[in-house]
Amino acid sequence: MPGGVKEMRCDLAVIGAGIAGLSAALFAANRGIETALVGETGEILFASGLMDLLSVHPLEEGKTWDDPWAALTALRRDIPDHPYARMPAADIAAAFDALLAFLKNQGLPYRRRPDRNVEVPVAMGAVKRTYCVPETVWNGVRALEEKQPCLIVDFDQLRGFSARQIASTLEPRWPGLRTARLPFPGGTFSQQYAEQLAMALEAPRNRASLACDIRACLGAARSVGLPAVLGLYRVQMIFEDLQKRVGVPLFEIPILPPSVAGLRLRDAFHREIGRAHV
């Protein structure tokens, strides 16, 4: 074609390469539909790793819902042209099932309560209501619900994540949180980036060193929250190994973007998109 533009023919073109676009492309390809994906996947790096269904409706009132399916019923009644209103609840549930099955197969298992939203602490000490969370975050859901004695850990020079700020902001809802700032094993950086930390924890010696430092300040804590940097490629293995070394449940706290959670999702989708020939 003129100008060297290559013509491509397909049954379906998906425009947009965020989580929705990537999921749609995979759903289609897995059903034998010849699919092309148009877009840059950079936006997925801004993902927290949390998967929402519906927790606030109407937005202008800021009404929150424990039951996302009841919220969907209200949304369909109030906004009949909304995309959610055009899909049966069973199809939405099946889409979530398919997405979570795919992520589990990619080594990124998720947890949820099928008929309830959950609350999870996130960066800066906010609490987010969501539907599905990574397995590495789930212990934080339980710790917040039970108001467990908990230690929040941050690292020298890691920007955008302060254990003290998180504990201070959560104090009215979760009193008695303790904090610790630790040096990160595996190298000295003038400024630490989340991806560097996640890669460093691929090495067993770094996990052993970090676990030793955490145990030294554990005290009476029954759980430990850390920034979501516990591995990039072997997330579940690294998380379980570090948790075993520390001796109490750990949980990741989603960090500000660009995030390791976004990198994990991007890599998982890229692997599967390549396999599916999208």
Segments the model singles out, each with a brief description of its role:
Residues 25-28, 53, 152, 273:
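Hydrophobic structural packing positions in well-ordered secondary structure
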Residues 27, 91-94, 98-101, 165, ...:
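Alpha-helical scaffold segments in soluble metabolic enzymes
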Residues 39-76, 186-199:
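Conserved N-terminal glycine-rich FAD pyrophosphate-binding loop of Rossmann-like flavoproteins
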Residues 53-143, 148-155, 166-172:
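Dinucleotide-binding Rossmann-like beta1-alpha1 core, especially the glycine-rich loop
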Residues 10-37:
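N-terminal Rossmann-like FAD-binding beta1-loop-alpha1 element of flavoenzymes
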Residues 41-46, 127-277:
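Predominantly flavin-linked oxidoreductase catalytic cores and closely associated redox partners
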Residues 33, 97-108, 244-248, 274:
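Generic secondary-structure signature for well-ordered alpha-helical cores
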Residues 1-12, 30, 43, 58-60, ...:
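Extreme N-terminal leader/targeting segments of oxidoreductases
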